[in-house]
């Protein structure tokens, strides 16, 4: 007994060391990298909380509010703190899940693969995205689903676990809609392999718990003509366009890269090994994981044939394949110990290399990305510039205001306008909000997203001093608004330097004598 307790303590100690090391490695980029397009946009969810939002449920905004103490703590590190904490917690939960279902050795392999995955450890584990809480709640949901629904004779404990599965699936839904793939997997498994659950009241209670947690999203959408669902339907609808081999290729290669190419190959091998087994030899947990993970990947792969589909949309499903592959590697370890160690070491090395190289690239631009562009499109093809130069832009704008003799006390009557949610959110977070300036995004709702609701809160007056700001990466001429102003004057150009070289430009325009009651191509009527 003492030996067993000692072994568990030692196991927990080493696991804690691994999690801490992983956390320390990620703290540096979390603190020094400026926010990406999506991250800075989700900051607006915390700034203007609601039951739900145009493009996603509310959980990511709530998470930002929680870890910034309702935005009282400022800076990139605190925006991302929730991602660092939840991803670390997910590692612990995953370890004990896999240990309970398979073995301690499989659990170690699972957490090493989780840490080596670019999606789980960077995209959702470093950056603050809706995937961040989604992954955490999906891991928790699986923690309670796997040992309960596979039981041939579920008792009180299994039923309680299944209800908790419904609870955490509901929270995952409040992060991203397609988290309901968990219920699809659980339901299919019950219908095919374990119909005794259909006689258990706990099964239906778990469904009710999930449905209750979905109420905020449906309430908000009911008030807003179900605009979130029509928006996403237009993004992934199968019958609105022709077959697109480019989007299909981009999705599949992106999916492979996001998971780490080394791991992706392992996932395929492990899955094939399970599928070719004879039925009596297949573990029930393996069946459940395959039924849960495969459909989501197949569905989004099908979508990618017709529409641009982002590779991270299938990300949470790969938790199932990490668990399956962990068991496969644990079984292979006794026969091919060196091979297993080398493969996982390669995956870890590749992860560290990408994290370090990516951070250095964003901060220094040591790799030339994209061809030289015209002056007003400088940096257009360098995606790393989304996360660079915005602090310089604020300094440049403050310098411009100082040269113009505009005092900080008069900025409450100043407005910056933009015409797209990006770079509007960057301009808002790094320039407008710190200076007490209102940012208004003008355009149709597909372009401005949540700013449609933010604009109505902030308002725009004809007496406001108005600037239009755009950048060379996303340049849009202010001439689209010319009919509403007596004149539009180029006021200043801010040069963004990286490694002592100009890499993009921020353009400031003075918009004089605003005269429109509504804006062309915009849903707003301000007066």
Task: Tell where the protein language model's regions lie, with residue ranges.
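Transmembrane-helix signature of polytopic, membrane-embedded enzymes
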Residues: 13, 94-116, 135-136
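Transmembrane-helix motifs of polytopic, lipid-linked glycan transferases
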Residues: 16, 81-101, 140-144
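Short helix- or helix-capping micro-motifs
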Residues: 19, 110-116, 169, 173
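Membrane-interface transmembrane helices that cradle and orient dolichyl/undecaprenyl
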Residues: 99-105, 141-161
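Short acidic/glycine- and proline-prone juxtamembrane loop motifs at membrane-interface regions
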Residues: 125-133
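Transmembrane-lumen/periplasm boundary regions of multi-pass, lipid-linked membrane glycan transferases
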Residues: 171, 182-307
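Signature aromatic-anchored transmembrane alpha helix within multi-pass, membrane-resident enzymes
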Residues: 331-370
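Aromatic/acidic, Gly/Pro-rich catalytic loop(s) in extracytoplasmic/lumenal soluble domains
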Residues: 398, 402-406, 438-527
């Amino acid at each position: 007994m003492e030996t067993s307790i000692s072994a568990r303590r030692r196991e927990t100690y080493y696991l804690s060391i691994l999690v801490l090391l992983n956390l320390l490695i990620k703290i540096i980029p979390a603190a020094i990298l400026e926010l990406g397009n999506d991250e800075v946009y989700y900051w607006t969810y915390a700034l203007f909380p609601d039951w739900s939002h145009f493009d996603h449920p509310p959980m990511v905004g709530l998470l930002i509010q929680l870890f910034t103490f309702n935005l009282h703590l400022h800076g990139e590190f605190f925006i991302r703190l929730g991602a660092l904490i939840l991803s670390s917690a997910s590692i612990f939960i995953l370890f004990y899940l896999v240990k309970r279902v398979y073995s301690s050795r499989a659990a170690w392999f699972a957490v090493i693969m989780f840490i080596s995955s670019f999606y789980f450890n960077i995209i959702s584990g470093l950056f603050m995205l809706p995937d961040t809480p989604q992954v955490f709640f999906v891991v928790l949901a699986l923690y309670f689903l796997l040992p309960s629904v596979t039981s041939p004779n579920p008792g009180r404990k299994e039923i309680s676990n299944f209800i908790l599965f419904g609870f955490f699936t509901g929270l995952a839904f409040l992060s991203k809609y397609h988290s309901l793939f968990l219920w699809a997997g659980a339901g299919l498994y019950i219908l095919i392999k374990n119909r005794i659950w259909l006689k258990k009241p706990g099964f239906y209670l778990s469904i009710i718990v999930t449905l209750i947690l979905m109420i905020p999203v449906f309430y908000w959408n009911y008030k807003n003509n179900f605009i979130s669902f029509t928006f996403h339907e237009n993004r992934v609808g199968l019958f609105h366009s022709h077959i697109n081999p480019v989007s299909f290729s981009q999705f599949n290669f992106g999916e492979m890269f996001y998971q780490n190419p080394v791991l992706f190959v392992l996932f395929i091998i492990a899955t094939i090994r399970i599928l070719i087994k004879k039925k009596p030899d297949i573990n029930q947990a393996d069946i459940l994981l395959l039924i849960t993970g495969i459909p989501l990947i197949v569905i989004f792969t099908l979508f990618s044939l017709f529409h641009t589909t982002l590779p991270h949309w299938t990300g949470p499903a790969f938790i199932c394949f990490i668990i399956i592959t962990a068991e496969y590697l644990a079984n292979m370890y006794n026969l091919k110990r060196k091979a297993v160690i080398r493969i996982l070491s390669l995956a870890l090395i590749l992860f560290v290399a990408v994290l370090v190289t990516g951070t250095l690239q964003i901060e220094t631009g040591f790799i030339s990305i994209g061809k030289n562009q015209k002056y007003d499109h400088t940096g257009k093809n360098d995606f790393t510039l989304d996360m660079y130069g915005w602090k310089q832009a604020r300094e440049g704008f403050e310098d411009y205001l100082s040269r113009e003799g505009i005092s900080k006390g008069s900025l409450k009557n100043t407005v910056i306008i933009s015409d797209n949610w990006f770079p509007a959110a960057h301009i808002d977070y790094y320039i407008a909000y710190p200076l007490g300036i209102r940012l208004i995004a003008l355009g149709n709702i597909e372009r401005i997203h949540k700013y449609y609701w933010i604009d109505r809160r902030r308002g725009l007056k004809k007496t406001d001093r108005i600037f239009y700001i755009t950048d060379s990466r996303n340049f849009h001429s202010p001439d689209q608004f010319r009919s509403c102003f007596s004149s539009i004057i180029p006021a200043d150009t801010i040069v963004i330097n990286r490694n002592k070289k100009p890499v993009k430009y921020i353009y400031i325009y003075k918009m004089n004598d605003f005269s429109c009651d509504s804006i062309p191509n915009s849903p707003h009527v301000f007066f």
